[in-house]
Amino acid sequence: REDTTQFIRSDSLVLQFLEYSNIPITDNNKVKLIKSGREKFEDLFEAIRGAKHHIHLEYFNFRNDSIANALFDLLGEKVKEGVKVRAMFDAFGNWSNNKPLKKRHLKAIREKGIEIVKFDPFKFPYINHAAHRDHRKIAVIDGKIGYTGGMNIADYYINGLPKIGTWRDMHIRIEGDAVNILQEIFLDIWHTYGSTCGNSVSGCGLQSK
């Protein structure tokens, strides 16, 4: 039988994805590949410590464990310094993990001055929302530093899991024009589920750095 398999260059696939997703191509970027959970959280926490204006976090879930607790403690300290902190997580992503953030945890987080909201909270009939989930993992610090990739906020990215072992995933740190795109993606969702403050880098009291 004749082999009709067609191969497409990987760079062509990337260009097709960018075209269909309406994500603009940018240059003037510095990108760092992060290969482990330990490296990701050390890098992210260090960037958060240096924040002067705002911190934006959008994740599928914040697992209620040691790394999330350390993160929210650090974010609370940044609020005391006058830094605006906004965070979002997916309602299903939170419900489906084995250590979800419950009402009492969210209350404690908000008492630290952190704005935190759920993406698409459960509403009847839930089936209408089953495929409408937010799997993004985005962090933006001061509009200057951005993170995205495959890792949520959970300590198993560092410690692994008993039945699985070491958890392998990747993340990237970005500095440059592409950070503005991550910022706009975050604010577009925040406009719906958080405060009404527009969907541009100048919204929510922000300034393009």
Whereabouts are the PLM-identified features?
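N-terminal localization/anchoring segments of enzymes in phospholipid and broader phosphate metabolism
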Residues: R1-K209
